[in-house]
Amino acid sequence: MIEQFYDLKPEVLALDRQALALCREQFAHVEGIRDYNQLKMLRAFTDSGVAAQHFFGSTGYGVWDDSRNKLEEVFCRCVGAEAALVRPQFMSGTHTLTVALFGLLRTGDTLLAATGRPYDTLEGVIGIGEAGKGCGTLREYGIRYDEVPLKEDFTPDYAGIAAKAKTATVVHIQRSRGYTQRNAFDLDTIRKVAQTVREVNPNAVIFVDNCYGEFTQTKEPLSAGADIIAGSFIKNPGGGITPTGGYIAGRKDLVEKISHRFTAPGIGADLGCTQDSLRDTFLGLYYAPGVVCEAVKTAIYAQCLLELCGVHPVPRYTEDHNDIVTCFDSGSVAALQGFCAGIQKNSPVDSFVSPEPADEPGYTDKVIMASGSFTEGSTIEISCDGPLRPPYTCYLQGGVNFTAGRAAVINAVQNAFFA
């Protein structure tokens, strides 16, 4: 059917048919995860007693916003948290993580990155090198930073973690890959890092950046030893519907502590109006398990198709998936730009736009991005990006439905490797 809508070369169509056949077993596996998570989501809604009245938000201060409180109750049930902040005021994943870090850390405390250097945009938050200099970084507030690089095989250095965690206040784990070519960490790895830390420092706070990982498995990192998780609602948990916002969830005492940085000291979680955002946030969250499944299926298909083209993606399509991201070395500026152009041209919004490399806040290299999304910056909708530095690695994520995701991917592959 796809050839009725797109001018695809015979050799590309043959690879498409082969990829679909090879992916059947993996598709069935992630559909099983979807079904479990959707039933868990349904029970979260029914057990919390969500009513139509909860779709109406508040204005002004947002004091006594029962609808906001109900949303946070539902989210807690979904991720196994004691408490949560689910708020439209969080502008991005980086902003959400920043609020959490500044809420947890005080002058003289130490932040330890246990899984290597964090994502590029967090370098400015922490104050690594010249990033964020003069902007009020953690380091400028007297908070120490240390990190444990990953081993050569991209696995955690548990001995290094044990040595450095003894004096750490907060231990940061980044579940997804950032701009590195490693697999997302599974829950067993997160659990082992947490156990390693607690053996030498029981009081350390285990903080997991959960961006891109929500609902890819049947459990979340709070069940694997994390104390706090954080992420963005324009990624997985928003289901491609929620237009903005983020979440911080976990231990009640820690969420309370963070809430005073989210608003102001002495005010905490009681303030924060929701205006007209609640219906879309409830709806996006409800649909998230199914949408995440479609994104993972798009990733599996892309990985298989790329392998058939002689490209080596991470992860492989046969591996377990713990985020929605696929990365691969395109090998050249032309291939990277060609793949991004193919994704952009076959996206529902701004399909006529040609992606061009540009400077982006928080990044040291020019970055090329393709995103024809309904929500600006959404990465649960299909998008791809990559820094313009050798080996010109491309990062593909999202796809709110597999049919459209497949169309974008196959056209991008043809554009990059069969031009």
Model-derived regions: residue spans:
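Conserved C-terminal alpha-helix-loop-beta "cap" of PLP-dependent enzymes
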Residues: E307-A419
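Structural motif
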Residues: E82-V86, D109-L112, T169-V170, A204-I206, ...
